[in-house]
Amino acid sequence: MYTKNDIMQMVEDEDVEFIRLQFTDIFGNMKNVAITSSQLEKALDNRCMFDGSSIEGFVRIEESDMYLHPDLDTFTIFPWRPQQGKVARIICDIYRPDGTPFEGDPRYVLQKVIKQAEDMGYVFDVGPECEFFLFNTDDNGCPTTDTTEKAGYFEMGPNDHGENARRDMVLTLEDMGFEIEASHHEASPGQHEIDFRYEPAMHAADNIMTFKLAVKTIAKRHGMHATFMPKPKSGVSGSGMHINMSLRKDGKNIFADENDKFGLSQDAYYFIGGLMKHIYEMTAITNPLVNSYKRLVSGFEAPLHITWSVRNRSPLIRIPSAVGGGTRIELRSPDCAANPYLTIALCLAAGLDGMKNKITPPENIQKNIFSMSEEEKAERNIKSLPTNLSDAVEAMEQDAFIQDVLGEHISNVYINSKKDEWDRYCRAVTQWEVDEYLDKF
């Protein structure tokens, strides 16, 4: 735990000249206010103000004053910036002038759900698996969807053209305090994954935001563009953000039970039941873009069906083979376009709801779901996730549980914005339509 004096001393000792006060908007976009070291004490006293009306989804212009409250434990120095006059960052919570937390701050939403878990004696650990593409840029440095490689799963150089960039990403992340467990080339040409160690929920969400910034920054230094867009190209696997979850109580993983045939405790089953009950209505948050649903299609290992399994990778929820302290629940539908604070908050809230109300999940599915007929899926009562953003938003709009977790402000802003996004998509004339119809009609 850092103190104010710790931060002031580190800034002086490390020759830090600029500090970025970072925060995240409702839609998962990172924002910042940059200050010089001369203004740091003011910022650490929670006296740094910004115009909230300028941030999409925050507040109206007549109530725009907002204050940034730095979370001191998020202080880190950017390794890629100059080593004289260094640049550091601190992630901030957003408060109103009257000293109350701003209900539109995604971090505040997660804090509230974490508090519920803590009141029950639990620590929620989260380990994300973030996938991304590295593409070439054009002569002007603008991103393209072009890649000159044809590499697939676990390939290495020289076939993996992003190997050097990925190595530098790993080294940079380690300099920033990440514990990197593995990195590798993914299934599609130009696609990569870097896995970092699980952390308590808030730290994990902060890490996802930091991870995306670092990956994009290092890619640019290698003359490439990193994108977390779920499905940037047709005909290849999209990029997901699998969420691995476990609960600890008194230092012990409460999901583990060595006497169960699958190694799962009753609370783990209830947690799975809660996730399965709420996932359809959560999907507008976990998969927030029109493009997200082009990843969630058959033929590319993406989960479509609301089922669970042990080891089998075709269902929505998977129980990896690790046992004991490593026992965890893996939710496979989210993608990296999702706001990690809202996504993790909903995962925890849904799981706790399952535990509180003893929601028993259906029988697990060991068979490859993609090989099942529609009749067999109907017989087993296997339901599917929403197939498009419109259906997902409609489900969210009708669900009181999701809106209660997110709060009225975020729910209303998010739903209205996503309705507008869908409407703009429906009105757009795409290149596919031009290619398909122009010379036929």
Where are these regions (language model features)?
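Glycine-rich, acidic/polar active-site loops that bind/position phosphate-bearing ligands
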Residues: 1-441
